[in-house]
């Protein structure tokens, strides 16, 4: 009998590197870890009131991972004007920038950034400072976390047009649960 080698007559394999879209900026592993640590807060932004007021057209272009500091500040001002966020959250959204000039103004207000990554880095820095006893960081940390929750909720609302409550009710209906008509928003009444 002849000897059989596992390397004999194998067809050649060519591995091509996957082409990636340079416009897509991926978050680092540290950013993803921090975002997972702070979790979700579906009630950080009252998207049900936004849904009922039909505010989706104002926010339909919102993408927290690809937004300029100027746009993020405008979105924060709009949320503040409708009474959906407090002044500090709107202010934090308006100050998300990588570079400032000597007068404290944003140097490149139209350059797109990943706002979630920006805030995750600040949260990481603050968590480190809190461990060393920095009281100012300890005071501001919850506000930065709330701002991330608001941006995440706004991104879901902008992409789907639904509030967290509507999405939860929709899931319950799909699972076969019977819900009274008076508890349902108008667009879900037809699904029951």
Pin down the residues of each PLM region.
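Type III/flagellar secretion export determinants
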Residues: 1-192
């Amino acid at each position: 009998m002849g000897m059989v080698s596992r390397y004999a007559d194998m067809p050649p394999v060519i591995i091509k590197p996957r082409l990636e879209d340079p416009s897509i900026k991926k978050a680092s592993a540290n950013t993803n870890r921090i975002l997972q640590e702070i979790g979700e807060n579906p009630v950080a932004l009252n998207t049900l009131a936004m849904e009922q007021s039909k505010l989706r057209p104002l926010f339909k272009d919102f993408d927290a991972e690809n937004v300029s500091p100027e746009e993020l500040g405008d979105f924060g001002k709009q949320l503040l004007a409708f009474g959906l966020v407090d002044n500090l959250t709107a202010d934090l959204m308006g100050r998300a920038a990588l570079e400032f000039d000597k007068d404290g103004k944003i140097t490149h207000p139209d350059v797109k950034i990943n706002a979630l990554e920006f805030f995750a880095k600040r949260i990481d820095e603050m968590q480190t400072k809190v461990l060393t006893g920095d009281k100012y960081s300890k005071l501001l940390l919850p506000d930065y976390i709330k701002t991330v929750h608001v941006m995440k909720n706004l991104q879901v609302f902008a992409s789907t047009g639904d509030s967290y409550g509507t999405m939860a009710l929709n899931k319950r209906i799909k699972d076969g649960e019977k819900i009274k008509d008076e508890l349902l928003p108008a667009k879900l009444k037809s699904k029951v």
